[in-house]
Amino acid sequence: MTFGWLLNHGPKGDSSIERRASQRPFFKPVSLEPRLARLAVNLACGPLANGACLDPMTGTGGFTIEAIMSGRHAIGMDLDEEMIQGARMNLEWAGSELNPFVVGDATNIKATLSDDVASISGVVLDPPYGRNSQGSMDHRALLHHTLASAREVVDGCLVLILPSEPRTEHLNRPLGKSERPPLKHYAWETIEEMLHETGWHYENAWYVSVHRSLGRVIVYATSAPQD
């Protein structure tokens, strides 16, 4: 499994670099930059023909926007109606008239999806934390229930993006265990246990620098066989 940026790839005239998160009409400081969102979508979902991209905690819509703008089917969900309205505004600003967004609970995805939904090839997650998290469930329980809910409807791959402490060295290969930076909200062992308990198999992780006090880790997992 290799990892990198695809430049000049996608529909003609499309440029994720020109759609910086801070330029969207509906913006939150925690929003992912489009290049990272596009990379996560491609890694989780593979070739366009594989099926739809599921973004069950869509927030401002970053993953879903990049999926749609690259020619994929996508479903963006959020429990917060304000986020759904903002995500729709952002997708229209990006140049699409599609409406792939729906109000729904990430911990009960099956109840939100319609029976005629396209086959889902992968799921992308950038979980909220603290004041950015909705509802009374703490962020650990929220992530655990969301991973289990996603596994019920996805028999493919998962990309989970987590904030981390910064690394002094940038790597262009998967992180070895001794190279993993401390995560901001979890222990690495907790993440691996969560994945295992919810039907996912940890494969690899990569580090992406954000600024001198923050990094992000891209965790890649595949669906484990279910009994």
Residue ranges and their predicted role:
Residues M1-D227:
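Class I S-adenosyl-L-methionine-dependent methyltransferase catalytic core
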